[in-house]
Amino acid sequence: MIDYKNTLNLPKTQFAMRGNLAIREPIMLKRWHQQDLYQLICQATQGKKTFFLHDGPPYANGSIHIGHSVNKILKDIIIKSKRLMGYCSPYIPGWDCHGLPIELKVEQLIGKPGKKVSASEFIIACRNYASEQVTWQKKDFIRLGVLGDWDNIYRTMDFHTEANIIRTLSKIIENGHVYQGNKPVHWCIDCRSALAEAEVEYYDYTSPSIYVIFAATNTHDVAARFGIPNVLSSISFLVWTTTPWTIPANRAISIHPNLNYQLVKVNQQGFILAADLVTSVLTYLGIQNWTVVKNIKGYVLELLRFSHPFMKFDVPVVLSNHVTINVGTGVVHTSPSHGPDDYLIGREYNLEIVNIVGPDGCYLPGTFSLLDGTSVYQSNQTVISLLKDRGALLHTGTIQHSYPHCWRHKTPLIFRATPQWFISMDKKKLRQQSLKEIKKIQWIPSNSQASITNMVNNRQDWCISRQRIWGVPMSLFVHNHTKKLHPQTSEIMEYVAKQVEKKGIQAWWDLDPIKILGDDIVNYSKINDILDVWFDSGSTHSSVINAQTEFANHEIDMYLEGADQHRGWFMSSLISSTAIKGKAPYKTVITHGFAVDSNGRKMSKSIGNVVSPQQVVDKLGADILRLWVASTNYTDDMTISDEILKRSVDTYRRIRNTARFLLANLNGFEPKQHSVSIDKMIILDQWAIDRAQVAQDEIIAAYNSYEFHSVVQRIMQFCSVEMGSFYLDIIKDRQYTTQYNSIARRSCQTALFHIIEAMVRWIAPIISFTADEIWGFIPGKRSPSVFIEEWYKNLSRLDAEQHMNDTYWNTLLQVRSDVNYLIEQARIKKNIGSSLETQVTLYSEPILAMQLRQLGNELHFVLLTSAVQIADYQEADNNALQSTRIKGLKITLNHATGRKCQRCWHYEQDIGNNTQYPEICGRCVINIAGNGEERKFV
């Protein structure tokens, strides 16, 4: 028997079936580096319209985690898709390099700055440590396939950036937004530092819950305000608090001016509390018998004096709208140095703002003899005992509530009043302008707008000063008596900035003030506070972007970070930019969720559910991680697990196998020489190109709306349904069996060529390594990289007016699906092996029958059967299957008649008619020895 294998056009390609990504990707990265791929991209896109995504700098400490990977991959997908859309879209990666975590790491390595380690040595060690961390993180980001200007990254510790941060502060000072105040701020005892709002996390915490008596200094005055005779032995306010340790700093009692307050009589004692809470509070305290004496509005009691429970002074009653009746007694113990609301009341009433707590969280000497030098948290019980001994404690218990904690140490915070520098949110209407700017921005997801609006509405003034070493110096001089800034502050800060450009922040510490101030030095003090690291990163729109030539005279289009950055980088950038130029620094803000495990829990070493991006990449390849990111709706928390990654692997295989089939069937195809014009192509091939055009339009729309999971879904639909389950199955016979150079085969190859040209671009932003690999196997002359291409422009739509339009082929898809069902049932029953062992009868209503007959004897190629007959719908017997998709269609399936062709495997009646080729059908004989078969439709 003749071996007919050599007469077939079997698929052939060097493009491997298996990705072996963990091995191949590093090789590709090496080639990208040798190509200087990023510069090739910049050259190719020079002069085009611009799209700028500004990289929010990750902190230069520790290995990258899965959240970092999500962030960088999303940015890379956007930038690569924008280049496909014809944009010049440079990407400058950055790092946040100053701050306490690095200081603490360096302290562990060399000790604290002091006697053994000088400040300059410590700064050098911090800089070296941060540089080392950046190097490692950069390597990991590059491994993810992120294309950027890795040779020209920005770091907030770069000398020129440090200088520009000083200049940014100078502009904000010039615009009148900065002031110094002795104001309570979140303070971490372990950090020995003030914390920014973005560095505060909230956890459940158990605190003391106590009810304290503040007795009136003059019961006659209080009774008079209530309009009653002075018949009670005492009158006291009943105060509830969860921070007994702050009572030594109490300087007032706050009540709401418009709430009703009742004086109630218990035995011969009078207690004042909010009228709405009397019953619930007294019942809770175990007081069964009381009498309501009088009810009045809070404002009537303003400025009455009440004795501090154990200190030798009295305090006033003050009015405040922040007092509520949600919890407590409607009467608030007020310590202006230990709470933001208390501080504001203190300023309004000119109360003493006394700092009783040191940086270590211990009471300062002179606070109270029993408390001096003890930890505030350990002293809660001491204060409670003091209150009890003085008869000022009515009840003690505990309460579990949400409480601020340090994001680094996970330990509870205190509010502590220290001299700090602030950006005022209201002095120059910065809050009002920021809220206006928020409305102009595109927020993705849209509910982000409400989140940041609420945060801006409720945030306190921004404490921008820190009492540390490793950071950008504020570069200020303050008058010793007036405490005002030097009148030439702008000029001084510019001088310092120029010195910092040469020597870094060490220039400030080395600076001799006399060189700047001359004889005026006796009147001014050098401020050695450094800036909050959130000011560093939040001002990069000014300190970095304005200094980058790539971004010259262009606004930033997009910021993209995790959901926690609403109160972090998005917030600090918004405030600093609005303070400088009255407008937001970005046009669009995208927020992504956190990576969580299959149970919805955040990644945690203690839980043991951490998914390491390095391990995923080393095992599965970066493209699998990238595909997981793109496949997940990033606007919510993103679930990752071994099972989910397996699904990404399955998705990847489908895409890769589709690409491999296309490439393998382009064997021997040279586009310039063999391409068939669209009007001469077989109709099914025109339809395939039409489907690719429709898919591309939808994919581009999804990229434009940043819905990458929709991109993946549409690519999968195209590969699995339109191609894999229909077109690619059908064309195998024509591709393999028709003559090598026939129009029938070249038409098909032309379609496959156009499809792979389009498809490689669709996947390039997501599975970048695989797209790059495919690019090298597509026939024809081409540019050095898919990443300098734009969307493929040689697709086309079918003419909707022609009879074999989309609607026609959709009908055939439905018919084929029903036939496939019958074939699959026959396979399950083991009645057949291959679909080519069958012939099918389609009992059709007249209109459908007419449509089916349009394909003539090519219809059976669509159905993958050896034969097909079309009969009248009414002739169908009870054995025919009623189509579930088309009302006017019933189907029967039978064994094909004839013998099996050893070449095409169809069952035909004419096998053996040709004595030279007795094992094959007449169609195959024509394709081997004749002029070749003709195809019009399929």
UniProtKB/Swiss-Prot annotation:
Enzyme Commission number(s): 6.1.1.5
A Pfam family that the UniProt record links to this protein: zf-FPG_IleRS
PROSITE patterns in the cross-refs: AA_TRNA_LIGASE_I (PS00178)
Class of this enzyme: ligase
Intervals of motif 'KMSKS' region: 602-606
Motif 'HIGH' region per UniProt: ranges: 58-68
Keyword Aminoacyl-tRNA synthetase carried by entry: yes
SUPFAM superfamilies assigned to the protein according to its UniProt record, in alphabetical order: Anticodon-binding domain of a subclass of class I aminoacyl-tRNA synthetases, Nucleotidylyl transferase, ValRS/IleRS/LeuRS editing domain
Catalytic activity: tRNA(Ile) + L-isoleucine + ATP = L-isoleucyl-tRNA(Ile) + AMP + diphosphate
Chief place of localization: cytoplasm
Cofactor: Zn(2+)
InterPro entries from the UniProt entry: aa-tRNA-synth_I_CS (IPR001412), aa-tRNA-synth_Ia (IPR002300), Anticodon_Ile_BEm (IPR033708), Ile-tRNA-ligase (IPR002301), Ile-tRNA-ligase_type1 (IPR023585), Ile-tRNA_ligase (IPR050081), M/V/L/I-tRNA-synth_anticd-bd (IPR013155), Rossmann-like_a/b/a_fold (IPR014729)
GO BP annotations listed: isoleucyl-tRNA aminoacylation
UniProt entry tagged with the keyword Cytoplasm: yes
Keyword line: Aminoacyl-tRNA synthetase, ATP-binding, Cytoplasm, Ligase, Metal-binding, Nucleotide-binding, Protein biosynthesis, Zinc
Positions with a binding annotation for L-isoleucyl-5'-AMP: E561
Highest taxon of the lineage: Bacteria
Cofactor note: Binds 1 zinc ion per subunit.
Function summary: Catalyzes the attachment of isoleucine to tRNA(Ile). As IleRS can inadvertently accommodate and process structurally similar amino acids such as valine, to avoid such errors it has two additional distinct tRNA(Ile)-dependent editing activities. One activity is designated as 'pretransfer' editing and involves the hydrolysis of activated Val-AMP. The other activity is designated 'posttransfer' editing and involves deacylation of mischarged Val-tRNA(Ile).
Entry similarity comment: Belongs to the class-I aminoacyl-tRNA synthetase family. IleS type 1 subfamily.
Subunit architecture: Monomer.
Protein name as it appears in the record: Isoleucine--tRNA ligase
Organism: Baumannia cicadellinicola subsp. Homalodisca coagulata
